[in-house]
Amino acid sequence: MGACCSSRRNRSPSLAALAEETEVVLRCLAGRVVDLPGGDEVRIAPDVGRPGQNFGYFKFPGPSRFAYVKFIGRAYALGSGRKFLLYLSRNFQVFGYEDGTGLHMLAKSLHDFLKFKGLSDRDLVVVDSVALTSQLRPLTLPIRSTSDVETLVAEEATTNYTSTENLLGQTQSSTHRPLGVPLSNVKTMGVPPTKPSSQRPRGKGGRPPARLKSIREETVSGMARAREECNSPSEHDRLTSEMTDCDTTRRYPPSFFK
Protein backbone atom coordinates (compact mmCIF):
# COMPACT_ATOMS: atom_id res chain seq x y z
CA MET A 1 0.00 0.00 0.00
CA GLY A 2 1.20 3.46 -0.73
CA ALA A 3 0.10 6.96 0.00
CA CYS A 4 -0.10 9.90 -2.33
CA CYS A 5 -0.50 13.55 -1.67
CA SER A 6 -0.89 16.69 -3.72
CA SER A 7 0.79 20.01 -3.25
CA ARG A 8 0.59 23.35 -4.99
CA ARG A 9 3.01 23.45 -7.88
CA ASN A 10 5.56 26.21 -7.54
CA ARG A 11 6.30 28.53 -10.42
CA SER A 12 9.39 27.99 -12.47
CA PRO A 13 12.23 30.47 -11.87
CA SER A 14 11.63 32.13 -15.24
CA LEU A 15 7.90 32.53 -14.62
CA ALA A 16 8.50 33.83 -11.09
CA ALA A 17 10.92 36.45 -12.44
CA LEU A 18 8.41 37.43 -15.13
CA ALA A 19 5.69 37.76 -12.49
CA GLU A 20 7.86 40.03 -10.35
CA GLU A 21 8.83 42.19 -13.33
CA THR A 22 5.22 42.50 -14.47
CA GLU A 23 4.02 43.50 -11.02
CA VAL A 24 6.69 46.20 -10.70
CA VAL A 25 5.88 47.66 -14.13
CA LEU A 26 2.13 47.72 -13.45
CA ARG A 27 2.56 49.42 -10.08
CA CYS A 28 4.78 52.11 -11.61
CA LEU A 29 2.48 52.75 -14.58
CA ALA A 30 -0.87 52.56 -12.76
CA GLY A 31 -3.17 55.35 -13.95
CA ARG A 32 -0.77 56.59 -16.64
CA VAL A 33 -1.02 57.00 -20.41
CA VAL A 34 1.79 55.17 -22.22
CA ASP A 35 2.91 55.68 -25.82
CA LEU A 36 3.03 52.37 -27.71
CA PRO A 37 5.29 51.52 -30.66
CA GLY A 38 3.69 52.68 -33.89
CA GLY A 39 1.93 55.72 -32.41
CA ASP A 40 -0.85 53.94 -30.53
CA GLU A 41 -1.57 54.39 -26.83
CA VAL A 42 -2.49 52.42 -23.75
CA ARG A 43 -4.00 53.62 -20.48
CA ILE A 44 -3.15 51.46 -17.46
CA ALA A 45 -5.93 51.03 -14.89
CA PRO A 46 -5.37 53.12 -11.72
CA ASP A 47 -5.96 50.21 -9.32
CA VAL A 48 -4.12 47.57 -11.35
CA GLY A 49 -1.60 46.90 -8.57
CA ARG A 50 -4.16 46.02 -5.90
CA PRO A 51 -4.66 42.32 -5.13
CA GLY A 52 -7.95 40.87 -6.31
CA GLN A 53 -8.97 43.86 -8.45
CA ASN A 54 -10.25 43.85 -12.04
CA PHE A 55 -10.36 40.18 -12.90
CA GLY A 56 -12.70 38.33 -15.23
CA TYR A 57 -13.07 35.27 -17.40
CA PHE A 58 -13.13 34.22 -21.02
CA LYS A 59 -15.59 31.51 -22.06
CA PHE A 60 -14.21 29.28 -24.80
CA PRO A 61 -16.15 26.71 -26.86
CA GLY A 62 -16.62 23.47 -24.99
CA PRO A 63 -18.02 22.39 -21.64
CA SER A 64 -16.80 24.44 -18.67
CA ARG A 65 -13.84 25.98 -20.46
CA PHE A 66 -13.04 29.23 -18.68
CA ALA A 67 -9.81 31.23 -18.68
CA TYR A 68 -9.04 33.38 -15.64
CA VAL A 69 -7.58 36.74 -16.72
CA LYS A 70 -6.71 40.05 -15.09
CA PHE A 71 -7.85 43.35 -16.59
CA ILE A 72 -4.96 45.85 -16.74
CA GLY A 73 -6.11 48.70 -19.01
CA ARG A 74 -7.30 49.87 -22.42
CA ALA A 75 -5.35 50.30 -25.65
CA TYR A 76 -6.29 52.59 -28.54
CA ALA A 77 -5.33 52.37 -32.20
CA LEU A 78 -5.49 56.08 -32.96
CA GLY A 79 -5.29 55.67 -36.73
CA SER A 80 -8.28 53.34 -37.05
CA GLY A 81 -10.15 54.26 -33.87
CA ARG A 82 -10.14 50.68 -32.58
CA LYS A 83 -10.27 49.99 -28.84
CA PHE A 84 -8.98 46.95 -26.98
CA LEU A 85 -9.38 45.81 -23.41
CA LEU A 86 -6.04 44.49 -22.16
CA TYR A 87 -5.75 41.33 -20.07
CA LEU A 88 -2.98 39.27 -18.51
CA SER A 89 -3.22 35.50 -18.49
CA ARG A 90 -1.88 33.23 -15.77
CA ASN A 91 1.46 33.00 -17.55
CA PHE A 92 1.50 36.82 -17.97
CA GLN A 93 0.85 36.93 -21.70
CA VAL A 94 -0.94 40.05 -22.96
CA PHE A 95 -4.28 39.62 -24.69
CA GLY A 96 -6.52 42.23 -26.24
CA TYR A 97 -10.28 41.88 -26.48
CA GLU A 98 -12.18 43.93 -29.06
CA ASP A 99 -15.95 44.02 -29.17
CA GLY A 100 -17.00 42.34 -32.40
CA THR A 101 -13.69 40.67 -33.33
CA GLY A 102 -12.94 38.71 -30.17
CA LEU A 103 -9.69 37.87 -28.43
CA HIS A 104 -6.28 38.80 -29.85
CA MET A 105 -2.85 37.58 -28.81
CA LEU A 106 -0.72 40.74 -28.52
CA ALA A 107 2.56 39.76 -26.83
CA LYS A 108 4.19 37.07 -24.72
CA SER A 109 4.92 39.52 -21.91
CA LEU A 110 3.98 43.01 -20.79
CA HIS A 111 7.52 44.23 -21.46
CA ASP A 112 7.38 43.06 -25.09
CA PHE A 113 3.96 44.64 -25.55
CA LEU A 114 4.97 48.06 -24.22
CA LYS A 115 8.46 48.17 -25.71
CA PHE A 116 8.32 46.33 -29.03
CA LYS A 117 4.96 44.88 -30.13
CA GLY A 118 2.24 47.36 -29.29
CA LEU A 119 -0.89 46.75 -31.34
CA SER A 120 1.01 45.50 -34.39
CA ASP A 121 -0.36 41.95 -33.94
CA ARG A 122 -3.92 42.99 -33.19
CA ASP A 123 -5.38 41.10 -36.18
CA LEU A 124 -4.15 37.71 -34.96
CA VAL A 125 -7.42 36.47 -33.49
CA VAL A 126 -6.82 33.56 -31.12
CA VAL A 127 -10.30 32.07 -30.88
CA ASP A 128 -13.90 33.18 -30.80
CA SER A 129 -14.57 33.65 -27.10
CA VAL A 130 -17.00 35.49 -24.84
CA ALA A 131 -15.78 37.97 -22.22
CA LEU A 132 -17.33 37.60 -18.77
CA THR A 133 -17.13 39.67 -15.61
CA SER A 134 -15.88 38.43 -12.25
CA GLN A 135 -19.46 37.33 -11.54
CA LEU A 136 -19.60 35.34 -14.81
CA ARG A 137 -21.98 37.81 -16.45
CA PRO A 138 -21.57 38.71 -20.14
CA LEU A 139 -19.58 41.89 -20.69
CA THR A 140 -21.30 44.47 -22.90
CA LEU A 141 -19.32 47.28 -24.48
CA PRO A 142 -20.72 50.17 -26.56
CA ILE A 143 -18.88 50.64 -29.84
CA ARG A 144 -16.97 53.93 -29.95
CA SER A 145 -16.42 55.87 -33.16
CA THR A 146 -13.13 57.40 -34.27
CA SER A 147 -14.27 60.89 -33.27
CA ASP A 148 -15.05 59.68 -29.75
CA VAL A 149 -11.56 58.22 -29.40
CA GLU A 150 -9.95 61.45 -30.66
CA THR A 151 -12.00 63.49 -28.19
CA LEU A 152 -10.99 61.18 -25.36
CA VAL A 153 -7.30 61.44 -26.26
CA ALA A 154 -7.57 65.24 -26.39
CA GLU A 155 -9.08 65.25 -22.90
CA GLU A 156 -6.32 62.98 -21.60
CA ALA A 157 -3.55 65.16 -23.03
CA THR A 158 -3.12 66.86 -19.65
CA THR A 159 -2.86 63.62 -17.62
CA ASN A 160 0.36 61.93 -16.58
CA TYR A 161 2.17 60.81 -19.72
CA THR A 162 4.93 58.21 -19.72
CA SER A 163 7.14 57.18 -22.63
CA THR A 164 8.09 53.54 -23.12
CA GLU A 165 11.70 54.64 -23.51
CA ASN A 166 11.78 54.87 -19.71
CA LEU A 167 9.05 52.65 -18.27
CA LEU A 168 10.15 52.98 -14.66
CA GLY A 169 11.53 56.51 -14.87
CA GLN A 170 10.12 59.90 -14.13
CA THR A 171 6.84 61.18 -15.49
CA GLN A 172 7.17 63.62 -18.34
CA SER A 173 5.59 67.04 -18.33
CA SER A 174 1.81 66.99 -18.31
CA THR A 175 1.78 69.41 -21.25
CA HIS A 176 3.33 66.78 -23.51
CA ARG A 177 0.56 65.78 -25.89
CA PRO A 178 0.19 62.19 -27.20
CA LEU A 179 1.45 61.33 -30.66
CA GLY A 180 -1.00 61.99 -33.46
CA VAL A 181 -3.15 64.49 -31.61
CA PRO A 182 -3.12 67.96 -33.22
CA LEU A 183 -2.70 70.83 -30.82
CA SER A 184 -5.88 72.41 -32.17
CA ASN A 185 -7.92 69.50 -30.78
CA VAL A 186 -6.81 70.20 -27.22
CA LYS A 187 -9.20 72.63 -25.56
CA THR A 188 -7.68 75.18 -23.24
CA MET A 189 -9.47 77.52 -20.87
CA GLY A 190 -8.74 81.16 -21.49
CA VAL A 191 -7.50 83.09 -18.48
CA PRO A 192 -8.77 86.69 -18.30
CA PRO A 193 -5.98 89.28 -18.19
CA THR A 194 -5.29 90.75 -14.78
CA LYS A 195 -5.22 94.50 -14.24
CA PRO A 196 -2.33 96.30 -12.59
CA SER A 197 -2.70 96.94 -8.90
CA SER A 198 -2.94 100.70 -9.53
CA GLN A 199 -6.06 100.20 -11.73
CA ARG A 200 -7.90 97.81 -9.44
CA PRO A 201 -11.06 99.28 -7.83
CA ARG A 202 -10.78 99.84 -4.12
CA GLY A 203 -13.27 100.94 -1.50
CA LYS A 204 -12.73 102.85 1.67
CA GLY A 205 -9.60 102.10 3.61
CA GLY A 206 -8.02 100.27 0.67
CA ARG A 207 -10.38 97.29 1.01
CA PRO A 208 -12.24 95.88 -1.99
CA PRO A 209 -15.93 96.89 -2.20
CA ALA A 210 -18.67 94.47 -1.14
CA ARG A 211 -19.74 93.75 -4.76
CA LEU A 212 -16.20 92.81 -5.79
CA LYS A 213 -15.94 90.55 -2.73
CA SER A 214 -19.19 88.75 -3.65
CA ILE A 215 -18.00 88.27 -7.24
CA ARG A 216 -14.74 86.81 -5.97
CA GLU A 217 -16.62 84.37 -3.71
CA GLU A 218 -18.84 83.27 -6.62
CA THR A 219 -15.74 82.72 -8.78
CA VAL A 220 -14.07 80.58 -6.12
CA SER A 221 -17.22 78.49 -5.62
CA GLY A 222 -17.57 78.05 -9.40
CA MET A 223 -13.97 76.87 -9.68
CA ALA A 224 -14.59 74.37 -6.88
CA ARG A 225 -17.64 72.97 -8.67
CA ALA A 226 -15.71 72.71 -11.95
CA ARG A 227 -12.89 70.87 -10.16
CA GLU A 228 -15.40 68.36 -8.73
CA GLU A 229 -16.91 67.80 -12.18
CA CYS A 230 -13.46 67.16 -13.68
CA ASN A 231 -12.64 64.64 -10.96
CA SER A 232 -15.91 62.73 -11.42
CA PRO A 233 -15.68 59.52 -13.53
CA SER A 234 -16.29 60.12 -17.21
CA GLU A 235 -18.55 58.09 -19.46
CA HIS A 236 -15.54 56.34 -20.92
CA ASP A 237 -14.39 55.20 -17.45
CA ARG A 238 -17.85 53.78 -16.85
CA LEU A 239 -17.64 51.61 -19.98
CA THR A 240 -15.75 48.96 -18.07
CA SER A 241 -17.48 49.44 -14.74
CA GLU A 242 -18.42 45.80 -14.67
CA MET A 243 -14.79 44.83 -15.18
CA THR A 244 -13.89 46.43 -11.85
CA ASP A 245 -16.27 44.19 -9.93
CA CYS A 246 -14.23 42.48 -7.23
CA ASP A 247 -15.84 39.24 -6.11
CA THR A 248 -14.09 38.28 -2.88
CA THR A 249 -15.88 34.98 -2.44
CA ARG A 250 -13.89 31.83 -2.03
CA ARG A 251 -14.61 30.68 -5.57
CA TYR A 252 -12.10 32.99 -7.25
CA PRO A 253 -8.36 33.43 -6.70
CA PRO A 254 -7.50 36.90 -5.33
CA SER A 255 -4.52 37.86 -7.46
CA PHE A 256 -2.03 36.72 -10.06
CA PHE A 257 0.96 37.91 -8.12
CA LYS A 258 0.56 35.85 -4.96
UniProtKB/Swiss-Prot annotation:
Pfam families: DUF1314
Coiled coil: none
Comp. bias regions, Polar residues: 163-176
Cystine pairs: none
Protein name (record): Gene 3 protein
Renumbered residue ranges of the record's region Disordered: 163-258
Compositionally biased intervals (Basic and acidic residues): 214-240
